[in-house]
A protein has these predicted regions:
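Low-complexity, small/basic-enriched stretches
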Residues: 1-67, 132-165, 172-173
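Nucleic acid-binding interface residues in structured DNA/RNA-binding domains
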Residues: 9-16, 65-164
Length: 173
């Protein structure tokens, strides 16, 4: 899993699938990390971080909640395009790596790599990008806890296609 231990987090938020480490500048979210089991939640250290946490908690209660916090997404031009395309996928829907690649005139593997490099998962919904015949990957893994988190997020949004509900194989993001 993409776990980080020694980051300077502005908050550590308890969520149904673990603890999220929230990184932000004064006025933009720069990262969300899935923290290792046993990590303790920590209150937000700024008003902006409190807003980020409140919006995440609101989304976790109501999948139709909208995020309005500014994001600072740093990456290659291709990754930027993929992340923007993911932000355009409506809640309750998914796109395959191939479909997104076709829209962006790219290839499925490059889309999967951009999904895996997404610095702000949950808000930038890489979980909505799935394999052609399965869930695909999540956090650079194709099985285990990361796929359980992806499955949880998709089920929460009522987006998980029933053939994929128990599926854990795939590639990419």
């Amino acid at each position: 899993m993409r776990y980080h231990r020694r980051m300077d987090y502005q908050a550590k938020l308890k969520v149904p699938f673990g603890v999220l480490g929230i990184r932000c500048t004064g006025d933009a979210v720069t990262g969300i990390d899935f923290l290792p089991a046993g990590e303790k939640p920590r209150r937000a250290t700024s008003a902006f971080a409190e807003t980020v946490c409140a919006q995440l908690l609101h989304y976790l209660e109501n999948p139709d909640a909208q995020f309005s916090v500014p994001l600072e997404l740093n990456g290659t031009p291709h990754r930027q395009k993929v992340w923007q395309a993911m932000l355009a996928i409506p809640r309750g829907q998914t796109r395959s790596y191939g479909e997104l690649a076709s829209e962006l005139k790219s290839c499925a593997q490059a889309v999967g790599q951009a999904c895996g490099a997404n610095p702000i998962p949950v808000i930038v919904p890489c979980h909505r990008v799935v394999g052609k015949a399965g869930l695909g990957g999540f956090m650079k893994h194709a099985s285990g806890d990361p796929l359980d988190i992806k499955r949880w997020l998709l089920a929460h949004e009522h987006a998980i296609p029933s053939p994929l509900a128990g599926e854990g194989q795939g590639r990419g993001g």
